[in-house]
Each structure stands twice: as C-alpha cells, then as structure tokens.
Amino acid sequence: MVKLNSIEEVDLLANTKSAKKRIAIIKKRTLRNKMIKSRVKTFIRRFNESLATKDIEAIKERLRLAVKELDKAVSKGVLHKNTAARKKSKLYAKFNALLKSASNE
C-alpha cells in the first residue's frame, strides 16, 4: 500500500482527464476551506483576547463577529452546524460568565 502525503502526489496517479479535473477542484476547495477555517479561528481568538479588557461593549461586538463568522462557515459547508453550535455555546458561556462576574463586583 502506498502512503500519499499530498494532493500533488495523487495528481501523479490520476490517469483520466476527469480525475485530473477533480484533483484541481479538490485543491481549490481545500484552499478555500483552509481560508474560511483560519478566519473563524482568528475571530474566536480576537474574542478570547478581548475578554481580558473587561470592556463589555467591545467584547459583545467581538462575540457578534465571531458568531457571524461561524454561521458563514456553516452556510458555506465548511463546518457542520453542530460544530458551530458547540463553539458558539462555549463563546456565549464565557461571555455570560464575564457578565455575571462583572455584576457581582
């Protein structure tokens, strides 16, 4: 059994024209998916970094943007809806914990 490390190595194995076309499509979609996932991670990271500022309005805006980006990824088929729901739930839990601690102070 041959172990392939990348799509380029698979490209060498493609014999038919349609297989080569499919490989090109896969490359394009893989790149698109990586970009979208990277964007989602960036927005989540920015939200987590903003939690340290304790500025509720700024945090709320970052939360809104992160949720929006997660929803976009779901609509484009990059993330499963349950994955996005789980990530949003964690974000809201952090936000609500911050609100609760802020109201206790």
Swiss-Prot record:
Keywords: Ribonucleoprotein, Ribosomal protein, RNA-binding, rRNA-binding. GO terms for biological process: translation. This is Small ribosomal subunit protein bS20. Binds directly to 16S ribosomal RNA. One of its GO terms (molecular function) is small ribosomal subunit rRNA binding. PANTHER family: 30S RIBOSOMAL PROTEIN S20, SMALL RIBOSOMAL SUBUNIT PROTEIN BS20C. The gene is rpsT. It holds the Pfam family Ribosomal_S20p. GO terms for cellular component: cytosol; small ribosomal subunit. Belongs to the bacterial ribosomal protein bS20 family. It comes from the Bacteria. Transmembrane segments: none annotated. Signal peptide: none annotated.
